[in-house]
Amino acid sequence: MSSFTYPQRYLSKINFPFICYKFNYFPLISSIAVVALSGALKLHFAYEFLGRTLPLHSFIVAILVTYASYAFDRGVGCSEDEERSGLFKSALLVSAVIATILSFVLFANILLAVPYIIGYLYARGIGGHRLKGGYGVKNAVVALTWASTMPIFLCDLSFAGLLVYLFFFSKSFVNTIIYDVRDAERDREAGIATIPTLMSKTRLRALLILISAATHCILIAAALGGMLACADILVLSALHSLGYIIIYSGACNVLRNTLVDGEWILYTLYSSFRAVFL
């Protein structure tokens, strides 16, 4: 009995794992997965800071929303060779659509469209105008997406809630600037105005430390005053943020994804250890 095998160009169109292996997309997939999990953990800690418990279905929805937003952005922005771009872009966009549909099935709230709308304007824009502007606009948009999504789940506009949203806005704003440092030289050569291209490393580091320290001090004071919970997590976040700002506002890239994108995973491990042993 004769055997028949598909040529690779056909196999790659129908076999998603093969696409990932052939074009080495596993780092990108793992990066999106870490960001999606971290997004849900941010919401988890937002609930914790307010002394509440995050419902399981909301946790799952947060993963889906974060995944869909990042997968859509990466799919639209994929600019490698035509075969690589076309194949993986389609897979990312299809998975983003599926995640979006599932999120609305689990959380039927029209306000859930807000992060998707912001994500679309960020990745695609309207009339050629996107929200990926320079001078910190991109950083503020990403941070605002996080901060505006949390009230949809928490339904809390109290002063304590606003402090929590401010905290996550600040954290996201600082972290996106940290990631812009990596591309500072290339952006400068291309004439793209990002905050790291406009400031010296010393001034940039001082600015990020100031933003982070001020926000953490406000939240820690609120926690010590009984307005918020989990003061130890906030102290840990303050120290951790100070560390990676000092390290990654320079040329170092070692373990950056783990320590920056994965910070809330690290805090979850600490929280679990505390619950079991302390």
Q: Where are the predicted features?
A:
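Functional transmembrane core segments of multi-pass inner-membrane proteins
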Residues: 139-185, 213
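Membrane-embedded alpha-helical segments that form the functional core of polytopic membrane enzymes
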Residues: 44-72, 113-117, 158-178
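Hydrophobic alpha-helical transmembrane segments
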Residues: 44-52, 98-107, 151-156, 217-225, ...
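Small-residue-rich segments of transmembrane alpha-helices in multi-pass membrane proteins
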Residues: 37-42, 88-99, 139-154, 196-201, ...
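Extended hydrophobic alpha-helices typical of membrane-associated regions
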Residues: 80-94, 232-278
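Solvent-exposed interhelical
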Residues: 61-95, 172-216
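Intramembrane alpha-helical segments
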Residues: 84-157, 242-248
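Short, Lys/Arg-rich, polar N-terminal cytosolic tail immediately upstream
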Residues: 1-26
